[in-house]
Amino acid sequence: MSKNKDQRTAKTLEKTWDTLNHLLFISSGLYKLNLKSIAQITLSILAMIISTSLIITAIIFIASANHKVTLTTAIIQDATSQIKNTTPTYLTQDPQLGISFSNLSEITSQTTTILASTTPGVKSNLQPTTVKTKNTTTTQTQPSKPTTKQRQNKPPNKPNNDFHFEVFNFVPCSICSNNPTCWAICKRIPNKKPGKKTTTKPTKKPTFKTTKKDLKPQTTKPKEVPTTKPTEEPTINTTKTNITTTLLTNNTTGNPKLTSQMETFHSTSSEGNLSPSQVSTTSEHPSQPSSPPNTTRQ
């Protein structure tokens, strides 16, 4: 019945807390509006009332929580008193009478120790906790969380009944005295322990720098062949020697110019070109008939 009452009171307190919070929110919103002075005064009074009621509900919550704490302490005190009143007995062996009973109160003091049962495989660390009561103090040792270590599965031991030759890896040569078969089978035990293997780091090979040649073909311009223009052949002036020209003309007195012109013509006949004087003389006298000269070669 007491539990039901506590639940009801808790529910009613929660409801009142929620309603008061809503009222406070509404009143603060209305107060922000520009109302008349009387309305603002009433809203402020309501806000004060709601805040005081909220404080009261908070106090009730705290009181109910303290009541629950006092109930738990009372239960602990009752349990300790029951333990004190009941004095358990244990058996002791007497050589004359056989078995006799004796009380724990004669041996143990006011502090009662409660030991937790521990399994043989798991170790538990005991942590003492003290509980204060009105008259006596009881120390209870509670086991902490056990630390379970995983056991390594050992391989099963093989029976040593069968003595087989494969069990022995080698026969030491110190046993063999004169047996040739033993010397053939035996192995010598090395005196020195095998040393550490020396690890040689590979040395870096020297890198040769190679300059890449230009693979492009060198374009050489062909040499210009000098073109020689044909030069004009030199004109050779050939003068005929031992040639006597005798001009036998009938009319020597008639045209003295004509004879002189013909002489010049024969002297320049070996050359290919005509002189301007010849051209001019021929053009001046086209109509005059020229008598063929009679040339005699000696």
Curated annotation (Swiss-Prot):
Skewed-composition ranges (Low complexity): 127-155, 233-259
Sugar-bearing residue positions: 70, 72, 80, 86-87, 92, 100, 103, 105, 113, 117, 119, 135, 137-139, 141, 144, 147, 199, 203, 219, 231, 235, 237, 250-251, 253, 269-270, 275, 282-283, 287, 290, 294
Biased composition (Basic and acidic residues): 211-232
Family under the similarity heading: Belongs to the pneumoviruses glycoprotein G family.
Cytoplasmic side: 1-37
Stretches assigned to the Extracellular side: 67-298
Lineage: Viruses, Riboviria, Orthornavirae, Negarnaviricota, Haploviricotina
Name of the protein in its database record: Major surface glycoprotein G
Membrane-spanning residues: 38-66
Disulfide topology: 173-186, 176-182
Annotated spans, Disordered: 119-161, 190-298
UniProt feature, compositional bias: Basic residues: 190-207
GO biological process, one term: virion attachment to host cell
Record keyword Membrane present: yes
UniProt biased composition (Polar residues): 260-298
UniProt-annotated site: Cleavage, residues: 65-66
The entry's keywords: Disulfide bond, Glycoprotein, Host cell membrane, Host membrane, Host-virus interaction, Membrane, Secreted, Transmembrane, Transmembrane helix, Viral attachment to host cell, Viral immunoevasion, Virion, Virus entry into host cell
Pfam families listed in its UniProt record: Glycoprotein_G
InterPro entries the record matches: G_prot
